[in-house]
Amino acid sequence: MRKYEIMYIIRPGVEEEAQKALVERFAGVLTNNGAEIINTKEWGKRRLAYEINDLREGFYMILNVNSNAEAINEFDRLAKINEDILRHIVVKEEEK
């Protein structure tokens, strides 16, 4: 298993309960596919560097996980499909 950092931006118009459900759903996608979530950070609502789909703000989430490639690929696939996630990125952390 390798260490990854995942950052995704949730559409700002999503209600708080739906937002929590979305975060739990994507955390479940990772854990159900064998990943271990080390740390979760909610950066909250922040201004975007540039407009995405005519939106100027987004709710940022950052996850640090130990995972295999299958869990990361499934997360990536579902994040691309979901309309409430504006952008996401998965970065593999370097071995020290």
From Swiss-Prot:
| Family matches, as Pfam families | Ribosomal_S6
Keywords of the record? Ribonucleoprotein, Ribosomal protein, RNA-binding, rRNA-binding
**Function, in words:** Binds together with bS18 to 16S ribosomal RNA.
Organism of provenance: Bacillus cereus (strain G9842)
**GO annotation, cellular component aspect:** cytoplasm; ribonucleoprotein complex; ribosome
GO MF entries: small ribosomal subunit rRNA binding; structural constituent of ribosome
Q: What SUPFAM superfamilies is this protein classified in?
A: Ribosomal protein S6
Q: Which family does it belong to?
A: Belongs to the bacterial ribosomal protein bS6 family.
Q: Which domain of life is it from?
A: Bacteria
Name by which UniProt lists this protein: Small ribosomal subunit protein bS6
Gene Ontology terms: biological process: translation
Question: What InterPro entries would the database entry show?
Answer: Ribosomal_bS6, Ribosomal_bS6_CS, Ribosomal_bS6_sf, Ribosomal_S6_plastid/chlpt, Transl_elong_EF1B/ribsomal_bS6
